[in-house]
């Protein structure tokens, strides 16, 4: 991958087990930023951080951010586009879960 990827996760229902598989895949392909917006975004950010840390023997650094109830998907995308240092200039992918 030329640039580390940036993802905005739109949560429609809060935590679902599929998130674990998604995060594992994103780690595998080198995603460096993950913004979360929608239902229970703060909790999902914590879950993602825990998944990146794992048991602590081989932690993966991924910059994460949760967006409050007053923020839109557009706000989350805008922030992701502005971030470049350490995460690259690549496009922002929006994923709904």
Can you annotate each of these PLM segments?
Residues 1-97:
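ATP-dependent carboxylate-amine ligase
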């Amino acid at each position: 991958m030329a640039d580390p990827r940036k993802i905005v996760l739109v949560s429609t229902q809060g935590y679902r087990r599929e998130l674990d598989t998604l995060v594992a895949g994103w780690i595998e392909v080198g995603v460096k930023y993950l913004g979360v917006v929608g239902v229970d975004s703060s909790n999902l950010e914590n879950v993602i951080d825990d998944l990146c840390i794992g048991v602590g023997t081989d932690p993966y650094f991924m910059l994460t951010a949760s967006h409050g109830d007053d923020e839109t998907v557009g706000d989350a995308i805008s922030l992701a586009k502005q971030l470049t240092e350490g995460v690259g200039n690549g496009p922002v992918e929006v994923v709904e879960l």
